[in-house]
Amino acid sequence: MEEDEVAESWEEAADSGEIDRRLEKKLKISQRENSKSKSPPKAPVVIQDDSLPSGPPPQIRILKRPTSNGLASNPNACSRPAAPVKSLAQREAEYAEARKRILGSASPEEEQEKPVADRPARINQAEEIRQPNNVIRQPLGPDGSQGFRQRR
């Protein structure tokens, strides 16, 4: 019945020693459970001695790579066929063809001259017309009063 009694406040419980008794009781219960669970391990622990031989060493297998088309694969050979070497003229022709297909022009020289002439005129004018920004401050109010300097 002692556990069923509830103190009005924790201060009363601390003064009467009730909190200490309950803590000691719970501590004894947990210590009993720990001592029961600390029984010796059921499985034996085997400690190997280095002086005794320790069975055969593990076997190591060296596996070979699978062969393709009956030939052993060469580490330097690629699985895809080697592309034929193209001359400079062939590469330039293919580049020009692709450029024409994508961009609409075959030579890069046309594109380099074009952006200079296409520059918008408005940007050029804005750089020349810019004036410095001067801020004009009026320390007095609009009606001649002190404005922000006025003390209340």
From Swiss-Prot:
What's the family?
Belongs to the SZRD1 family.
Bias (Polar residues) occurs at 66-77
Against Pfam families, the record matches this protein to: SUZ, SUZ-C
Outline the segment boundaries, as ranges, of region: Disordered: 28-152
PROSITE patterns hit by this protein: SUZ (PS51673), SUZ_C (PS51938)
| Species | Xenopus tropicalis (Western clawed frog)
Q: For the SUZ-C domain, which residue ranges apply?
A: 111-152
Which residues lie in Basic and acidic residues bias regions?
Answer: 89-100, 113-130
Name listed for the protein in its UniProt record? SUZ RNA-binding domain-containing
Q: Which cysteines are joined by disulfide bonds?
A: none
Q: Where are the transmembrane segments?
A: none
Q: Which residue numbers delimit the SUZ domain?
A: 42-107
